[in-house]
Amino acid sequence: MVGVTRTAITVRRGAGHAELVLLTAAAAWAWVVLRRGDTGSGAMAWELPAFLGMWTVMMAAMMLPATAPVAALYARTVPVHRTPRMTAFTAGYVLVWSAAGLPAYALATGAAHIAATHPAAGTAAAAAVFAVNGVYQLSPLKDRCLTKCRSPIGLLLRYASYRGPSRHLRAGAHHGAFCLGCCWSLMLLFMAFGVMNPWAMVGLAAVVTAEKRLPRGPLVARAVGLASLALALAVFWAPLLAPNLTGGGMTGMTRAYA
């Protein structure tokens, strides 16, 4: 009876840690919604520090809901001080996605320049973006990374061997690296749809969560890959499918170049 009670307490504590991560994601979404009013005006040109801050909050909003169960499970492997150590794990995870903002900035700047100066080339660039995502979504490397994100038990066993004051940060960063490997091509679609495009954020966040949490997540990944390949062809006939590259609905950084 005592064992059952302890198990129930552990489960409840794990659920509480998941809720903490979800609350963080909700706060990030609230920031994005409020900030959207500023970025949509076209008066603001993103500098790198501002872009990295915005990108980090975006990634927290989009990626943490799918990662909350893993963070909570990690907290349950820690005997004491679970909340601060889970916070360090989550921070390490977000740090990886924050670092991904550096190439994202270069790509977003390039997309803005293409849309403003070479609209015809923008359609070809959009087709390339959709094609890259489609091919990667169907690749063995995507499957491998997605498997690690969906079934992290092996990773958690590895993290148990980590030592030192930074072990929890390292564990989160390691898990974040696998998730980056799983989802980087989806984030590439922001080049086509526009950074800070709220509908793109919601759609891509839904895809990420479905891939990682639904029983048929790998099937979702393949379906998205096939749809992306179809968009790579369709964008030549319907350029507005990629508004950020074809100038049909410029948002965020692209507007700064208009």
Label for each model-derived stretch:
Residues M1-V57, V80, A112-A121, P140-Y162, ...:
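Histidine-/acidic- and/or cysteine-rich, low-complexity loops and terminal segments associated
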Residues G3, T7-V11, A50-V94:
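Juxtamembrane transmembrane-helix termini in multi-pass membrane transport proteins
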Residues H17-V21, E47-F51, R85, F89, ...:
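Residue-level signature of transmembrane alpha-helical entry/exit and packing/kink sites
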Residues A18, L22-A25, T123-F130, G134, ...:
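Residues within membrane-spanning alpha-helices of integral membrane proteins
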Residues L64, F130-D143, T209-R213:
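Transmembrane alpha-helical segments that form the membrane-embedded catalytic/substrate-channel core
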Residues R82-G110, C182-R216, L226-S228:
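A small-residue-rich subset of transmembrane alpha-helices
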Residues T117-A125, G217-L226:
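Membrane-interfacial entry segments at the cytosolic side of transmembrane helices
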Residues D143-M187:
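A mid-sequence, solvent-exposed acidic-amphipathic segment
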